[in-house]
């Protein structure tokens, strides 16, 4: 390997073993990189975040001593090159010639994919200690930023598991617990989030700090070191189709060049490898987000090998050190490619950035509009993500009209109204590809890819899509938006964030109200109830002291609370500051016009939630983690995690809310189900997600909600219930002329009148239709849904709600079960005739819209139509609430997450029977 500087500590001197002989713990890695930063004049260490468990996240800036002394100038040069419009050709050439290229090398974002972090130690030591000329040259020409361990909390969980399962003799069986790990595994962070899907949702502190750090450097190369199945070999970029159309063509070309040069090194060593195959590049939420900002992004996927090695299918044993070496050699090869081609890559980077702001470029004539919302907390969260990525936006100072805007349903509006207060995000700016990737309503998928996907689906039911095909941020957040085919510039002003966390007081106040449109209002209510404050909720829009309040508004009524007003106000202020809500005092209890009065039926008294969350083996860790995180960070209240395996030995009377996340595998036992059923009947609110809900819908007599496939014998009854819901929402009476007639009418219309003419399918036909359509369910697409605006679960939720769905169970509800959210949005069309879609009928004068974004085959749209996504039903003194999927998917589906927040916090008071405690 050459000569090494003895003044730099060897890894073994700190770890106690050679790199690759064992798995280094997070504490060992942090100790070693900090020691190296102190010893070497070629490295600076930067702490960019802390994990939930308090572990430091660092990156090392590695370069020549000269470059490190000029880092401020280098960063300034990079900043100028990233915004080159004001630079002339000579200045650009001069900056490129004097600026080292940057590379960001990142490892082990999944904590149980360990070899990457260990290989980073080999890389760092080699760069700092080697005295070979090629390394010296590399550091003269490059600034190398190494993030050695992106998920220390997950790695800590993994290394602990390995220690616990290590035996006296080496174990090379990939099926053993030493290699597989155990639930909840080390993949995710403390809250079990997959951090590799968090690069633009930025839910976690690891991601927020990392994004901020990466973005200030604009690395020309970004490496992401992973592991895959134990019996695979080694994968690296480039990806195969589908490839996101917003990735610049030059990056695809450079990806191929880097791959050829890396492959040459592997060929010399006779190491197996491949590119493409399962690796596609449509979803922009991995570390590949850096591509949209100008980086060549290269994924490493090493076949997983825990410490003892793996016996492979050819009979050889692959050691852990080999796995570490593969990633080390890859890194050196890629860094040399960057050094070799850096000037040309820099030139392409600048050309691309220039094209993003060109008046006739690809992104010149498009803007995205976020329409005004009363949900200030959600809008602020959305804008924070734009700020984090350096995306510019403004606000309209007055209303205007734009031509040919497209809404979430894909409808083109010839003259669309853009109200005052709308957020305008022009696509023509330096981060144009990223803006387009995360805000465009539909990612383009070529006909060739669609054909291959269709063929694969029909052959064996599989997919060539690796992740979701929809991720539009406005849809994920449940914010109404428009795509406008023009560069909007009129009547724009800087956005001013509304006041938050304060109280607008008034003399002789009788109550304090927080508007229920804001998601933060739910956490505000939960925190107050945790402090034994009596809280009410407004079940209908209200108007007091000239202030309008949305349904779902939170009311602290002095009449209800025996606490001294000053002490009560202290608690209110603290909760307001913690959640960022604005509190308005009122001294008038009489509602204006026919709106609610403060002592009437629309002011419902809430019950403090006592929350339990089912956990342990078989539970989907991502669903569990996202709910756990939501309760901790948004509600800020105590709750308990219960092992479903020990449920029969527990006293469930302590809880009035139990949340059952979706499952990876297994089912609840019969005894667990019986226990939960009795608990519900005694007043509990049971909230069940995904596959867990599917199991309970299948249980005889547990729930009135059924699965679509089990209801075709009674399809007509479900269709009648559907019509009844629709008719109950109409704003006019169609047979008004017959109401006051004295003669009995003989020509009345009934819901089944249309059915007779349309000749719906019989049970056998419906079963065949369903069996065929099941094959085409999406792997992740955004669909339109309609919400029951009279139901308490939809507080803070708009009438039309985007839902990210996949092959989730489809629920059917009638009679005593409420379909709170159904798939499909009905829009008026006078020319539309009544249509039969599967089991259901679309009323005359209406079109039904399903697809918003992503790949949904027409067969799947039909199957989804009018099925229920969210149901609520009373059972005894309690209730059952079922979600068809994970409502807080990746912590980013804010629209559906609000439904879950409402269920958890408001359920005990609004959906279950409360008891007056004497």
Question: Across the structure, where does each feature detected by a protein language model lie?
Answer:
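Well-ordered mid-protein domain cores that form the structural environment of catalytic cofactors
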Residues: 86-90, 97-99, 154-157, 173-184, ...
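Short, solvent-exposed turn/loop segments enriched in Gly/Ser/Thr/Pro and often Arg
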Residues: 149-152, 162, 225-232, 692-693
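Core alpha/beta catalytic barrel or barrel-like domain that forms the active/cofactor pocket
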Residues: 176-201, 222-238, 299-301
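Active/ligand-binding-proximal structured segments within catalytic/core domains
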Residues: 118-120
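Aromatic- and acidic-residue-enriched segments that line the glycan-binding/catalytic groove
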Residues: 156-172
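Short, conserved secondary-structure transition motifs
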Residues: 139-158, 723-725
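Active-site neighborhood of phospho(di)ester-bond hydrolases with catalytic His/Asp-centered motifs
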Residues: 106-107, 147-149, 222-225, 689
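Intrinsic-disorder/low-complexity accessory segments
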Residues: 1-114, 123-131, 135-142, 197, ...
């Amino acid at each position: 390997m050459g000569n090494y500087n003895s003044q730099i500590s060897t890894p073994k001197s700190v770890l106690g073993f050679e790199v690759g002989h064992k798995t280094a713990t997070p504490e060992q890695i942090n100790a070693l990189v900090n020691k190296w930063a102190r010893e070497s004049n070629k490295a600076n260490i930067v702490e960019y975040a802390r994990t939930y468990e308090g572990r430091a996240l660092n990156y090392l800036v590695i370069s020549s001593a000269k470059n490190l002394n000029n880092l401020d100038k280098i960063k300034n040069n990079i900043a100028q090159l990233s915004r080159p419009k004001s630079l002339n050709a000579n200045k650009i050439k001069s900056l490129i010639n004097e600026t080292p290229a940057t590379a960001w090398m990142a490892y082990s974002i999944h904590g149980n994919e360990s070899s990457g972090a260990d290989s980073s130690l080999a890389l760092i030591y080699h760069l700092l200690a080697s005295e070979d000329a090629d390394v010296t040259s590399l550091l003269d020409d490059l600034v190398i930023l190494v993030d050695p361990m992106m998920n220390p909390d997950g790695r800590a969980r993994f290394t602990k598991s390995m220690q616990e399962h290590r035996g006296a003799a080496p174990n090379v069986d990939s099926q053993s617990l030493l290699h597989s790990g155990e639930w909840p595994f080390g993949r995710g962070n403390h809250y079990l989030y997959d951090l590799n899907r968090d690069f633009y949702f930025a839910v976690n502190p690891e991601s927020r700090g990392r994004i901020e750090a990466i973005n200030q450097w604009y690395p020309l190369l970004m490496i992401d070191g992973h592991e895959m199945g134990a019996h695979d070999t080694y994968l690296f970029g480039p990806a195969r189709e589908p490839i996101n159309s917003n990735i610049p063509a030059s990056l695809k070309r450079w990806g191929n060049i880097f791959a050829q040069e890396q492959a040459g090194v592997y060929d010399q060593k006779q190491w197996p490898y491949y590119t493409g195959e399962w690796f596609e590049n449509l979803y922009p939420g991995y570390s590949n987000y850096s591509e949209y900002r100008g980086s060549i992004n290269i994924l490493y996927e090493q076949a997983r090998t825990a410490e003892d090695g793996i016996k492979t299918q050819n009979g050889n044993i692959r050691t852990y050190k080999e796995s570490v070496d593969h990633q080390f050699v890859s890194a050196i090869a890629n860094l040399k490619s960057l050094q070799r081609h850096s000037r040309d890559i820099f030139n392409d980077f600048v050309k691309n950035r220039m094209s993003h702001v060109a008046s006739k470029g690809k992104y010149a004539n498009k803007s995205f509009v976020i329409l005004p919302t009363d949900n200030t907390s959600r809008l602020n969260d959305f804008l924070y993500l734009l700020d984090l990525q350096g995306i510019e936006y403004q606000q309209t100072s007055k209303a205007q009209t734009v031509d040919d805007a497209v809404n979430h349903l894909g409808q083109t509006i010839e003259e669309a109204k853009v109200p005052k207060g709308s957020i305008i995000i022009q696509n023509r700016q330096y981060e144009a590809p990223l803006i387009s990737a995360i805000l465009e309503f539909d990612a383009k998928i070529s006909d060739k890819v669609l054909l291959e996907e269709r063929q694969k689906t029909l052959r064996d039911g599989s997919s060539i899509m690796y992740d979701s095909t929809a991720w539009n941020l406005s849809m994920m957040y449940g914010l109404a938006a428009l795509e406008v085919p023009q560069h909007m510039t009129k009547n724009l002003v800087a956005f001013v964030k509304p006041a938050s966390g304060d109280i607008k007081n008034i003399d002789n106040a009788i109550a304090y109200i927080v508007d229920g449109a804001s998601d933060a209002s739910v956490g505000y209510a939960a925190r107050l109830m945790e402090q034994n404050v009596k809280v009410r909720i407004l079940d209908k829009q209200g108007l007091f002291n000239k202030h309008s309040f949305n349904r779902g508004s939170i009311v602290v009524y002095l009449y209800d609370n025996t606490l001294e007003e000053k002490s009560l106000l202290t608690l209110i202020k603290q909760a307001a500051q913690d959640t960022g809500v604005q509190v308005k005092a009122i001294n008038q209890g009489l509602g204006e016009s026919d709106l609610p009065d403060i002592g009437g039926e629309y002011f419902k008294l809430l019950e403090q939630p006592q929350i339990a969350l089912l956990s342990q083996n078989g539970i989907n860790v991502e669903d569990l983690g996202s709910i756990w995180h939501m309760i901790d960070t948004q509600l800020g209240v105590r709750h308990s995690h219960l092992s479903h395996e020990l449920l029969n030995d527990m006293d469930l009377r302590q809880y009035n809310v139990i949340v059952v996340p979706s499952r990876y595998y297994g089912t609840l036992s019969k005894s667990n189900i019986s226990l939960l059923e009795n608990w519900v009947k005694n007043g509990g609110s049971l909230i069940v997600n995904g596959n867990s809900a599917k199991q309970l819908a299948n249980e005889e007599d547990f729930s009135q909600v059924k699965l679509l496939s089990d209801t075709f014998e009674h399809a007509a009854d479900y269709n009648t219930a559907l019509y009844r819901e629709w008719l109950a929402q109409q704003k006019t009476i169609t047979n008004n002329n017959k109401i006051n007639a004295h003669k009995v009418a003989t020509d009345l219309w009934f819901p089944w009148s249309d059915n007779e003419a349309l000749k719906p399918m019989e049970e056998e036909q419906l079963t065949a239709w369903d069996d065929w359509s099941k094959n085409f369910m999406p792997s992740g697409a955004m669909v339109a849904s309609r919400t029951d605006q009279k139901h308490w679960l939809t507080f803070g939720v708009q009438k039309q709600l985007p839902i990210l769905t996949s092959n989730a169970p489809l629920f059917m509800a009638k009679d005593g079960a409420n379909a709170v959210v159904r798939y499909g949005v009905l829009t008026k069309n006078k020319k539309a005739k009544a249509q039969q879609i599967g089991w259901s009928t679309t009323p005359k004068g209406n079109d039904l819209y399903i697809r918003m974004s992503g790949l949904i085959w027409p067969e799947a749209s039909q199957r989804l139509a009018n099925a229920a996504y969210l149901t609520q039903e009373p059972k005894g003194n309690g209730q059952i609430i079922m979600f068809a999927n994970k409502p807080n998917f990746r912590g980013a589906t804010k629209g559906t997450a609000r439904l879950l927040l409402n269920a958890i916090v408001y359920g005990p008071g609004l959906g279950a029977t409360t008891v007056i405690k004497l």
